[in-house]
Amino acid sequence: MSAQKSAGIQLLLDAEREATKIVQKAREYRTKRVREARDEAKKEIEAYKAQKEAEFKKFEAEHTQGNQAAQEEANAEAEARIREIKEAGNKNREQVIKDLLHAVFTPSPEAMAAH
């Protein structure tokens, strides 16, 4: 009976070893699949990111041109307005200076109001 028990125990030990090998292979396979899935996800994320960056650059380029044209137009209008103001200032400059000097240096006999 001892030989039968020994053979039965040996059979159980062999089955346990075989089961351990199967479980270990399953774990290794699962770990490998997780790594592959992670790598695949990274690649998809990078591709999606590159696509969105390209779309953003295209959008930015299209809208920057419009903004640039508006900026140039605004600059031209500002320059024209500055020229007008300078011309108006130069036109009446002498008279304004005379009026200011006259007002500052000519005393007027008016009483000051008390506060």
Swiss-Prot record:
Chief location category: membrane
SS bond partners: none
Topology relative to the membrane: Peripheral membrane protein
Compartment annotation: Vacuole membrane
Alphabetical keyword list: Hydrogen ion transport, Ion transport, Membrane, Transport, Vacuole
GO cellular component, one term: vacuolar proton-transporting V-type ATPase, V1 domain
Keyword Transport carried by entry: yes
A GO MF term: ATP hydrolysis activity
One Pfam family, short name: V-ATPase_G
PANTHER family: V-TYPE PROTON ATPASE SUBUNIT G (PTHR12713:SF11), VACUOLAR ATP SYNTHASE SUBUNIT G (PTHR12713)
The protein's role, per its UniProt record: Subunit of the V1 complex of vacuolar(H+)-ATPase (V-ATPase), a multisubunit enzyme composed of a peripheral complex (V1) that hydrolyzes ATP and a membrane integral complex (V0) that translocates protons. V-ATPase is responsible for acidifying and maintaining the pH of intracellular compartments.
SUBUNIT field: V-ATPase is a heteromultimeric enzyme composed of a peripheral catalytic V1 complex (components A to H) attached to an integral membrane V0 proton pore complex (components: a, c, c', c'', d, e, f and VOA1).
Family membership: Belongs to the V-ATPase G subunit family.
Protein name: V-type proton ATPase subunit G
Species, as recorded: Neurospora crassa (strain ATCC 24698 / 74-OR23-1A / CBS 708.71 / DSM 1257 / FGSC 987)
